[in-house]
């Protein structure tokens, strides 16, 4: 198992190097856009000579049509669906929540890695893979640190230009977001599946290395196939680069996400049902409290990602409507007989978009609540080198000399009480002090399954 963990870390290390090289590779430099003020492009439209339209569209410009003819004006970046102030609020929220989610994933990754964790169980690699996926996905937000939509640090390469696959930064961040999301969701689902099968005694053999290989291959396929058709780009309602086509988004992300979410939720509810049956038979109602948190976590996470899915579906269904009002807006601006003030901005719901972008960044926080706040994590850190070295020993010794012996004694007794029977089946059938979270983190790979007759 240690050998597998070492190979896993080596693979992750080289993957990071590859992604970094993609982000920094010297792709053909984009021609410097020529942006001029022009009375022809009124309102927030941006002037761009239409003579080289085909090449300009490849690098992110969208030219306006008027009376069936392409004009030397392009759609502004960011899009007029939201005001600049609203765009900046979206960006700042994504930076804050993305950073929090990244730190949550990083904490889990470090906690369950050999850096801290001296022991391992059948779910250690799965938690590490899920945490690594979260960290990668949230890196796409952290790449936007210091950026905004109002000055030379704008995410848009130039006024009226959207990021496309031809931009190395766009390609790198899109790959990181897609791979991290798919890899994280797959491992979250397999963790719940394996835990339920193990508890029921259907699967007792450890298949973690096969799970890792399968999820890694699927994530690679779902990430790199879209590159063939240059699918990574910045949309009218996005803060960065991701799959540009609605068809690709549906096939390579949303369908998979929905399946993972439904399957994982079903398995975790079934696990909670098994625990409830055991608790009911043993007449220990107090142990139900230990499972309120995972149930709440599942409820909130399910709401978040189902909201994302249905919001996405609504955008796809209403795509023709948004395209029509955008065309009406640009036609109004191009019509010399109309005043600019008469042109109605094509607005979308700020609240719906804000919640959508927020939900995207809840995966790391949900994983932290589920796998990062439990007795086993506390035990891992207390047994690690970081709490068992000469420096910490001297610090604890000095604290004891200041009169904290009673406190330390109490903590020691509490710690002993919690973990004396950690490897015993009685901790499940009699004490029932462990919740679903602690069961998934328990280090005994060979405990007997709980079978309700």
Swiss-Prot record:
It is found in: Membrane. This is Frizzled/smoothened-like sans CRD protein G. Its main location: membrane. The keyword Transmembrane applies. The chain crosses the membrane at residues 90-110, 125-145, 171-191, 210-230, 251-271, 297-317, 353-373. Residues 111-124, 192-209, 272-296, 374-453 are cytoplasmic. GO terms for cellular component: membrane. The keyword Glycoprotein applies. InterPro entries: GPCR_Fz/Smo-like. PANTHER family: FRIZZLED_SMOOTHENED-LIKE SANS CRD PROTEIN F-RELATED (PTHR31787:SF7), G-PROTEIN-COUPLED RECEPTOR GPCR FAMILY PROTEIN (PTHR31787).
